[in-house]
Amino acid sequence: VYDAYRPQSAVDHFVRWAEDLEDTAMQPCFYPEEEKSRLFAHGYIAARSGHSRGSTVDLTLLDEASGKELDMGGTFDYFGAPSHTDYDGLTPEQRANRALLRDAMLRHGFRGIKTEWWHFTLQEEPFPDTYFDFPVRAPD
């Protein structure tokens, strides 16, 4: 699991970061093919998130024997075409791995989005209109 519940205050921080067009330090890693000014329009950043409703999870699959992540043909939180579920540049193995993840999540009541192969939201959300903002703390 890469990400699950995210307080609304953390989402607000992402929004402030995305609105600061001068801060492009992360562009080479996370959005080299995108203009930062287009991250909202392309759906990579939003003022509201299913993560803050406690109903969205970002995840991948691991190989049981090795404990290593399966090759999904792209990295988590990459804002660009390789993250799209229907990306044409995937190998057959990568396509099969994405299908395995998608099918497992669909079977368990989650739906994905087109722009992020790792992002799934519970279809029958218990709090569809509530954006929580309680803090998350590491255990002592």
Describe the residue ranges of each PLM region.
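Cell-envelope/glycan interface and biosynthesis
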Residues: 1-139
